[in-house]
Amino acid sequence: QINAATVTTSGTQTYNDPLTLLNNTTLTSNGAGALGNVSFNSTIGGAKTLTVNTAGTTLFNDNVNIAQLTTDAPGTVQINAATVATTGTQTYNDPMTLLANTVLSSTGVAAAGNISFNNTITGDKTLAVNTAGTTLFDKAVSIGQLTTDLAGFVQINAPTVITTGTQTYNDPMTLLANTVLSS
């Protein structure tokens, strides 16, 4: 359990046990490269927000069910979980690699449910994004398969969205850039 507003280390952070957030929490590692990795090797729960700041890799190795999730820009994020669920926004500012077929979902309404990918997404896995808010793809996507649900909106500001399988957009889509969709 974490009841602190901040946890800051000069090196790695590894959470091997199920983690419950009792407070809105920012985890920061000031380590360079792999010395800055923040790894969650079990579930994360709690009706609180989680922000992870690191120049290393943020690794989610199990399911997440929290209020809000944000990762910063200098590092990378890897998702090896079946689900990342929030009641609010999800904002990924790092390049993302999918290590498992993953469903990202938010039950937030309108802007409170936005799921934003502000950097690239790679990995030969399936990504499903379910939200009544806006799903934003701001950089290039190169994955196995992509599906968005019916409830929200999709905005694409990326030059390319490439999949080895299908792409299914069930939301209304707005193109913010000249974009090539390729499967």
Q: What are the functions of these language-model segments?
A:
Residues Q1-S183:
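Extracellular lectin-like interaction modules
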